[in-house]
Amino acid sequence: MAFLPKFDSAGLVTCVTTDAVSGDVLMVAHMNDEALRKTIATGEAWYFSRSRNALWRKGESSGQTQRVVEMRTDCDQDAVWLRVEQRGAACHTGRHSCFYRKVEMAGEGGARLVFVDADRLFDPAAVYRK
């Protein structure tokens, strides 16, 4: 059976990335055809930045890399799931996961954010020179 990803109108597939050991969701990103091919060829996670309109290898700026342990696709082949060995933080904010805020539903349609697992593993200002 062939892997034939179905890219959206922008040429992207959604990628969910989890820690191969803990199962924690680390991040959700996007891949274009080139990012997908480079990920398969190198065993390192490559993504496509919609905001920068550019291909990027996870960790090329921060050193916080992802080695792919397993790649899966969903039933429609329009999304992929990477199980990775995360070295350092996955989030550009310096946190282990991009999902470091819990949404507490306050009733009456209201909600608020509460920080969980919010410790920083690195200082993004120092790493990215922002």
Curated annotation (Swiss-Prot):
Q: Which organism is it from?
A: Bradyrhizobium sp. (strain ORS 278)
What this protein is reported to do is described as: Catalyzes the hydrolysis of the adenine ring of phosphoribosyl-AMP.
**Cofactor needs:** Mg(2+); Zn(2+)
Question: Which EC class heads this enzyme's classification?
Answer: hydrolase
- Details of cofactor binding: Binds 1 Mg(2+) ion per subunit.
Q: What are its E.C. numbers? A: 3.5.4.19
What keywords were assigned to this record? Answer: Amino-acid biosynthesis, Cytoplasm, Histidine biosynthesis, Hydrolase, Magnesium, Metal-binding, Zinc
Where Zn(2+) is bound, by residue? C75, C91, C98
The record lists its disulfide bonds as none
Q: Which Pfam families match?
A: PRA-CH (PF01502)
The identity of this protein, by name, is Phosphoribosyl-AMP cyclohydrolase
Gene name, per UniProt, is: hisI
